[in-house]
Amino acid sequence: MRNIYVGHFSYVLGDLEQTVEQTVEENRTVIKDPEKFRSAGFDKHHICSPSTTAYDLAVAAVKPIAKYLNQVGAIIYSTALPINANIGTTFEETKDIKDLTDFPGSHLQSDFGLNDAWVIGLDQQACTGMIGSFKLAAALLRDTPQWSQILCVTADRFPQGSLYEQSYSLISDGASAFIISTEPIPGGFRYVEHHAITNGGMANTNDDATIGNFFPNTIDCITMNVKRAGLELKDINWMVVQNINVNAWKIVCSPSLLDYDITRVFHPSLPMMGHMISGDCIVNTQMLIESGKIKPGEYVLLYMVGYGLTWQSVILQYCG
């Protein structure tokens, strides 16, 4: 089977930084006690100014890695919120559905001169869309031998006036990107295996039910991903995870559940940005590389959960 490689991670956050105290004072959250956020690991988050669009974030995330784009066969453009999968703004005036199909992926292709790239929108996997992109891109590269690269992008900002708290987590606007390739990428990874679970019966649920389903399905998703990779949990050197309440990962990793070393669970961006919609795993993976803690040959498992409800994880092996 054709080897697939991943690297050149990039991300950008909303342009306005706020402390939990500021955002609570401005009524952007349901929780009204800043200390409850801080005790869960959240200190700050980033939101977009009114003039900044999700597409602006996408462009800013791709720019630093644009020089590495070569023979791009496809662009996978993921959005957690369907509203960010269209950049048209005049439908209410025109009533013309063309204004609902002004797709950001097409603009990205044109703006970066990726004229041979096929554009794919991925917009029903919520916060797991970026991990879904790994699987989709790997399958496409293996099925299309004339392609050598796929650009994966996710970009979301909440609409003006939105609550920036979901399932008791503080949210940041942001975008991230990476390149997946048939050739090794310096400082990158080899794609190993992916697993996903969707429970459509929980498509429209509340925060408490989401939390209740988090633990058993997280265990199942991670365990099955490891099994499908032909590995054991002890082979996973690092888990790069979603930025949620720090105590949740202590429960997941406890001896009665996953029985995994909590010191190997990596999410250092949590205090500075909270949960950046689909991008946590990319930000934290880049930070793991920059930390120098990960060594060539080590396995890392990236994990996210999103509304829908969908759980996804992917295992990569660091090439260095």
What would you call each of these model-derived segments?
Residues T29-P34, D99-G113, P145-D156, E193, ...:
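Acidic-glycine-rich active-site phosphate/pyrophosphate-binding loop
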Residues Y5-G7, G73-I76, Q149-L151, N237, ...:
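Conserved beta-strand elements of the Class I
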Residues M1-S51, Y164-M224, V305, V314-G320:
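Condensing-enzyme catalytic core mediating Claisen C-C bond formation in acyl metabolism
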Residues G132-A139, C152-A175, D220:
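Active-site glycine-rich loop that binds ribose-phosphate moieties when present
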Residues L69-K95:
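Membrane helical hairpin/interfacial module
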